[in-house]
Amino acid sequence: MRDMEFIEWYPRGYGVAFKVKRKILEEQSEYQKIEVYETEGFGKLLAIDGTVQLVTEGEKSYHEPLVHPAMLAHPNPRRVLIIGGGDGGAIREVLKHEEVEEVIMVEIDKKVIEISAKYIGIDGGILEKMLSDKHEKGKLIIGDGVKFIEENSGFDVIIVDSTDPVGPAEMLFSEEFYKNAYRALNDPGIYVTQAGSVYLFTDEFLTAYRKMRKVFDKVYYYSFPVIGYASPWAFLVGVKGSIDFMKVDAEKGKKLGLEYYDPDKHETLFQMPRYIVQML
């Protein structure tokens, strides 16, 4: 943070910067430093340990491609698990699907949820209801997602909305975790995770992809330009059973009011740089 700027530095000296009007909040939780800023042109910025999690004017460019391709590829996603997602964006998108009967969100840091509900406000009131156990479909569990997935199962879709695949979130990209996720899925089932910057976390992306191929019946990769991130941002999908992730229910998708992800152009998600594809 310099005078009136927030800069996140990525590997190899690459940075993403926002001009900011003021710092709204800085708190150290049990797990991490949480900051909220008011930017000049992109609304509020949520940062964790110095990394941009979202800007409110543009966060849908991340949450829509994270959630809807998997939800629209699954024939009947009634029970959904979100690991992470404390800002509320992922669960907001999941609940746009009327067939969903239950969403369980496992977030290790309650402070992220409380701060997001109070200062970020992208969830439409969902987080407050979940914090008070009053949401009819959403259930909040404060705990370790790695442990939770070892002990629970019966999910149609599992969404991992974690920090980058380095440091504290590294266990969420381990082969053991993928095996537990596969077991926890119903058949058919879909697992999706964000996988970092295509260009700047290439090794981490490739490692995760290769581990997932050892576990899931089919593995897919795609990317999307995300406002506030070092784009394009990568996502990985693991399938259990016979789901063809190359096909989605575009007609249902048209009714969701999406702003970034276009189900009619689903095939465009899979355009990766040629040198990345050659390494897969």
UniProtKB/Swiss-Prot annotation:
Listed GO CC annotations: cytoplasm
Domain PABS positions: 7-240
An annotated Gene Ontology molecular function: spermidine synthase activity
Sites where the protein binds S-methyl-5'-thioadenosine: Q32, E107, D144, G145, P168
Pathway assignment: Amine and polyamine biosynthesis; spermidine biosynthesis; spermidine from putrescine: step 1/1
Subcellular location: Cytoplasm
EC number per UniProt: 2.5.1.16
GO biological process: one example: spermidine biosynthetic process
Entry's transmembrane regions: none
Positions contributing to spermidine binding: H63, D87, D161, S162, T163, D164
Active site (record annotation): D161 (proton acceptor)
Keywords: Cytoplasm, Polyamine biosynthesis, Spermidine biosynthesis, Transferase
Catalyzed chemical reaction(s): S-adenosyl 3-(methylsulfanyl)propylamine + putrescine = S-methyl-5'-thioadenosine + spermidine + H(+)
Superkingdom of this protein's organism: Archaea
Gene3D superfamilies the UniProt entry points to: Spermidine synthase, tetramerisation domain, Vaccinia Virus protein VP39
Family from the record: Belongs to the spermidine/spermine synthase family.
Record's subunit section: Homotetramer.
Function: Catalyzes the irreversible transfer of a propylamine group from the amino donor S-adenosylmethioninamine (decarboxy-AdoMet) to putrescine (1,4-diaminobutane) to yield spermidine.
NCBIfam families for this protein: PRK00811.1 (NF002010), speE (TIGR00417)
Identification of the protein by name: Polyamine aminopropyltransferase
Source species of the chain: Pyrococcus horikoshii (strain ATCC 700860 / DSM 12428 / JCM 9974 / NBRC 100139 / OT-3)
Lineage: Archaea, Methanobacteriati, Methanobacteriota, Thermococci, Thermococcales
